[in-house]
């Protein structure tokens, strides 16, 4: 068949086209495949490589490119070095120092146990192999793969995995690829030197352990340290651009692969040590946390590599009885690998691994040990070492060596297909485990939702009783406001100031969350109602001598600053058309004025100290020198903070600006400026480290594992653990939805406040979905059909999406409406309450403890009327209550015993008879005088009217009737009380 001569088809060109077509198509649907189907790119790329490979279409066949062993080994080396370096860089700051115990337990005992167990089963199931050869095959699959582990480390499913487990799996997958070398070469020495124990031990300890592993770690630490120092120096001097800065770690990964291969050390361990040292202080991760250049490079390499692997899988050798790779043997071995390689060892060693908190976490860590690229690298490396004993030319992967060439021909022939079968099994099992777990949770959620809806829906408008206990957001009768709660701020030395200024710093300005700066995001927002002290008027605090002196000095400083700034501003803008020379002259004049200003302060330093030690009489004296001294000591900003900091401690000598010679004072001032800049850089580094430590102490996520709640920061470090004790066990279906989360939180560490011990309510289907949509960010989720779940903990309202992600946190602050102010509040011991009870305006039955108010009725407001609603009266408004209307978190009980009994979920308010002051003797006399029970001497200037005689009282019902007397007495009391309370003005 003739082909048009213009078409130049080659193997490399076809490979480029296949990789490009797959990458473009998969990129278009990558979000759906990863976030909805929970399938990683490695699985899909392997399937595509199988389709276009020699098994199906035969478009892409790397086995015909020539030396396939060497090509596969070098491609695998580069991919592994990049991935391992990236894993080490993305670990939290100083992670290996803080968690070396957990990582060591997973590397040494867990890997050793898996190596021995799998080697034993390979020896049993594969005929013709001795135990040493079986250990070599087992050593190839001992390490876990950092690429396949990304399915549980990053992505949507990773948000459901605790952060400390994600970090542990990442660190382990990066380390154990390099730590597989001791197991690999120990097995190799057992095969090559049988019966020669001295040679085996000497070669394994001196060459493998000390040189390849230990020296490789030191080499990696050196490369990482030098890279960190040089990139910080380049960034400090501003001689590196942004693109090179982001791609610098890729360069270091290539450097590790190159020098590690040249020196013959464990280049995978070199890459991990270099990455951990390079990102040891967290500076590089902080600088590159918003950019994803490294992720893009890794993604492209993963696409290409797994397409390549899918094309070279030896499917024809998976059922080759000549070398012992029957398919049923391989299936049994795969089941053994999945269940016995890691799970038993991790479950047994769980008490010795600090980062594994429960048996469920131990099972999860034991299961997610995927086999991938590291196994390919180890298998080809072991095959090449065995072939080097009898030939300099490596045997291709798809060729079975003859029995005459080497006595290890079966091991050379079967090590590659057995390893590839384990990799395919791991991709299928571990790649689909995430989807299966998520599907199981989804089905479980659907079943629970149907059960709750069927058994608990009743009442008006199809609402359930457990839903009615929440403050409904679609009612207008109850006035309350929702404010974002503080989930990011760390209380430091300005804690009291932040609390007092919460109303000013809150999100009350109507700004969107994206438009706020870092200081405003996460600040505490209050209801805007200032706390009213007892008596109605806050007491003015007397200032001490020191505070008066500081206030007086502050006024003088402000005055001097205004004079200086106005003078410089007027001089600056006298001429609108200044050339470059004029601008430079103005700048020098301003610097000269600043120098003179600072010079005058140095002359009067001693006098300032005498003035500061004097009394209030000495402080009343005001001189210009004192003003300058105060301004100097407090370092005012003239034009910029840099200039003001450079003026501190400098001595200036006035001279002509046209002189060409420099004085000694100017040279000294330049040296001091350099020292000042160095000190400022050191202080900025200290501030950065302090800020990073504060970020590490901020709680980010809480995970519930049985009766234990684990609180982590954003980096996955565990901050606290809380034990949850269930109090109510047996309830009916309806009550269980509302009250199964009745629990008390017992603090096992020290960083958790008692406010976290509230009881939990969950809404599965909110009543007003439109209102909930208005509470969440519109930019995050514009789909109005999505579900939201709300949790109420005391007066906190937490809104989550259907994936369990927290969208918003709000604080419910009840407000006093006009109707509420006009209503009678139950006051048992107050004068007004007793007076109204005595005249019959208030029934004695209502004078006691008020009946429980249905919260649903209270929410609906005055539109609903019933016997439980309070009457609306405008005659005698109640004085300000002694208790605060808006509920604060600080009012919660601090001990767990009080926490369990202090809050009742069925009550909307707590009424306390002792919350009001007892009646004084003077108030009692006034009350009795107003009621006519007691006669007191009265003057003409008294504001109260004397009680009317009974015989003078008249009414519509006649003077002698009981009803008339009652109304007349009521009118007199109303008049007296109105005058007393200041209503008749």
Swiss-Prot record:
InterPro entries: Cation/H_antiporter_C (IPR013928), Cation/H_exchanger_TM (IPR006153), Na+/H+_antiporter_fungi (IPR004712), Na+/solute_symporter_sf (IPR038770), Nha1 (IPR032516). Residues 538-558 have a biased composition (Basic residues). Residues 517-526 have a biased composition (Polar residues). Keywords: Antiport, Cell membrane, Ion transport, Membrane, Phosphoprotein, Sodium, Sodium transport, Transmembrane, Transmembrane helix, Transport. Residues 661-675, 887-920 have a biased composition (Acidic residues). The modification Phosphothreonine is found at residue 765. The chain crosses the membrane at residues 13-33, 37-57, 71-91, 106-126, 129-149, 177-197, 204-224, 245-265, 295-315, 320-340, 362-382, 411-431. Residues 559-572, 580-593, 676-698, 815-828, 854-863 have a biased composition (Basic and acidic residues). It is a multi-pass membrane protein. One of its GO terms (molecular function) is sodium:proton antiporter activity. One of its GO terms (biological process) is intracellular potassium ion homeostasis. It is found in: Cell membrane. NCBIfam families: c_cpa1. Sodium export from cell, takes up external protons in exchange for internal sodium ions. Also capable of exporting potassium ions. This is Na(+)/H(+) antiporter.
């Amino acid at each position: 068949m003739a082909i048009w001569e213009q078409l130049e088809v080659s193997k490399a060109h076809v490979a480029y086209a296949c990789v490009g077509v797959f990458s473009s198509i998969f990129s278009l649907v990558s979000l759906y495949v990863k976030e909805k189907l929970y399938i990683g790119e490695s699985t899909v790329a392997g399937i595509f490589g199988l389709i276009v490979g020699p098994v199906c279409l035969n478009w892409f066949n790397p086995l015909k490119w020539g030396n396939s062993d060497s090509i596969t080994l070098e491609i695998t080396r580069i991919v592994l070095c990049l991935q391992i370096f990236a894993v080490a860089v993305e670990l939290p700051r100083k992670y290996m120092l803080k968690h070396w115990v957990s990582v060591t337990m997973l590397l040494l005992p867990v890997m050793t146990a898996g190596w021995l167990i799998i080697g034993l089963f390979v020896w049993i199931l594969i005929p013709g192999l001795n135990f040493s050869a079986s250990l070599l095959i087992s050593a190839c699959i001992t390490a876990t793969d950092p690429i396949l582990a990304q399915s549980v480390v990053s992505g949507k499913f990773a948000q459901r995995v605790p952060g400390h487990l994600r970090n542990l799996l990442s660190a382990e997958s990066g380390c154990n690829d390099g730590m597989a070398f001791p197991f690999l070469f120990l097995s190799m020495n057992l095969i090559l030197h049988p019966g020669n124990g001295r040679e085996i031990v000497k070669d394994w300890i001196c060459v493998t352990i000390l040189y390849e592993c230990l020296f490789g770690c030191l080499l990696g630490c050196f490369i990482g340290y030098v890279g960190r120092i040089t990139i910080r120096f380049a960034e400090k001097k501003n001689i590196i651009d942004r693109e090179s800065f982001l791609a610098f770690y890729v360069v270091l990964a290539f450097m590790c692969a190159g020098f590690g291969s040249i020196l013959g050390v464990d280049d995978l361990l070199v890459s991990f040590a270099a990455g951990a040292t390079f990102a040891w202080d967290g500076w590089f991760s902080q600088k590159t946390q918003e950019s994803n250049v490294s992720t893009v490079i890794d993604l492209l390499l993963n696409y290409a590599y797994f397409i390549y692997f899918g094309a070279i899988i030896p499917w024809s050798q998976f059922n080759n009885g000549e070398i012992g790779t029957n398919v049923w043997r391989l299936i049994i071995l795969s089941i053994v690998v999945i269940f016995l390689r890691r799970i038993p060892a991790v479950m047994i060693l769980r008490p010795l691994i600090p980062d594994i908190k429960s048996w469920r976490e131990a099972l999860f860590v034991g299961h997610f040990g995927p086999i991938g690229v590291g196994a390919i690298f180890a298998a080809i490396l072991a095959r090449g070492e065995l072939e080097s004993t009898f030939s300099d030319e490596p045997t291709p992967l798809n060729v079975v060596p003859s029995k005459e060439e080497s006595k290890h021909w079966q091991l050379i022939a079967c090590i590659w297909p057995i390893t590839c079968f384990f990799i395919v099994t791991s991709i299928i099992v571990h790649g689909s485990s995430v989807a299966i777990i998520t599907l199981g949770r989804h089905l479980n959620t659907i079943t629970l939702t149907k059960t709750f809806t069927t058994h608990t829906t009743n009442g008006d408008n199809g609402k359930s009783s457990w839903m009615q206990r929440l403050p409904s957001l679609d009612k207008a009768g109850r006035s309350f406001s929702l404010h974002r709660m503080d989930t990011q701020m760390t209380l430091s030395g300005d804690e009291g100031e932040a609390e007092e200024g919460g109303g000013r710093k809150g999100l009350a300005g109507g700004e969107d969350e994206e438009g706020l700066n870092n200081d405003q995001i996460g600040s505490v927002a209050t209801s805007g109602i200032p706390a009213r002290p007892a008596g109605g008027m806050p007491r003015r605090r007397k200032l001490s001598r020191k505070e008066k002196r500081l206030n007086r000095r502050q006024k003088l400083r402000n005055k001097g600053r205004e004079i200086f700034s106005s003078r410089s501003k007027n001089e600056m803008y006298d001429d609108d058309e200044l050339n470059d020379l004029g601008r430079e002259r103005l700048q020098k004049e301003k610097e000269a004025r600043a120098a003179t200003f600072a010079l005058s302060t140095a002359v009067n330093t001693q006098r300032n100290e005498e003035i500061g030690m004097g009394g209030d009489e000495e402080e009343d004296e005001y001189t210009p020198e004192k003003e300058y001294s105060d301004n100097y000591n407090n370092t005012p900003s003239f034009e910029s903070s840099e200039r003001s900091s450079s003026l501190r401690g400098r001595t200036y000598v006035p001279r002509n600006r046209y002189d060409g010679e420099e004085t000694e004072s100017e040279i000294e001032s330049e040296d001091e400026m350099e020292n000042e800049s160095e000190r400022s850089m050191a202080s900025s580094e200290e501030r950065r480290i302090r800020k990073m430590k504060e970020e590490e102490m901020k709680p980010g996520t809480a995970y519930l594992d049985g009766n234990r709640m684990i609180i982590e920061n954003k980096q996955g470090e565990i901050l606290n653990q809380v034990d949850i004790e269930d109090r109510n066990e047996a309830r009916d279906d309806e009550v269980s939805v509302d009250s199964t989360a009745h629990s008390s939180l017992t603090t096992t560490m020290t960083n958790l406040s008692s406010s976290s011990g509230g009881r939990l309510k969950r809404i599965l289907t909110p009543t007003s979905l439109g209102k909930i949509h208005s509470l969440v960010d519109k930019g995050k989720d514009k789909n109005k059909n999505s579900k939201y779940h709300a949790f109420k903990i005391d007066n906190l309202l937490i809104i989550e999406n259907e994936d369990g992600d927290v969208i918003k946190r709000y604080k419910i602050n009840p407000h006093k409406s006009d109707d509420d102010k006009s209503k009678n509040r139950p006051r048992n011991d107050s004068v007004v309450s007793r007076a109204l009870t005595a005249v019959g305006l208030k029934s004695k039955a209502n004078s006691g403890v008020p009946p429980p108010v249905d919260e649903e009725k209270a929410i609906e407001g005055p539109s609903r009327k019933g016997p439980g609603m309070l009457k609306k009266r405008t005659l005698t408004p109640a004085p300000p209550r002694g208790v605060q209307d808006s509920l604060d978190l600080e009012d919660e009980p601090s001990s767990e015993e009080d926490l369990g009994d202090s809050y009742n979920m069925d009550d909307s308010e707590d009424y306390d008879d002792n919350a009001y002051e007892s009646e004084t003797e003077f108030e009692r006399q006034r009350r009795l005088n107003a009621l006519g029970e007691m006669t007191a001497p009265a003057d003409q200037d008294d504001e109260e009217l004397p009680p009317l005689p009974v015989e003078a009282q008249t009414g519509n019902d006649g003077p002698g009737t009981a009803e008339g007397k009652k109304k007349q007495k009521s009118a007199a009391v109303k008049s007296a009380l109105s005058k007393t309370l200041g209503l008749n003005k």
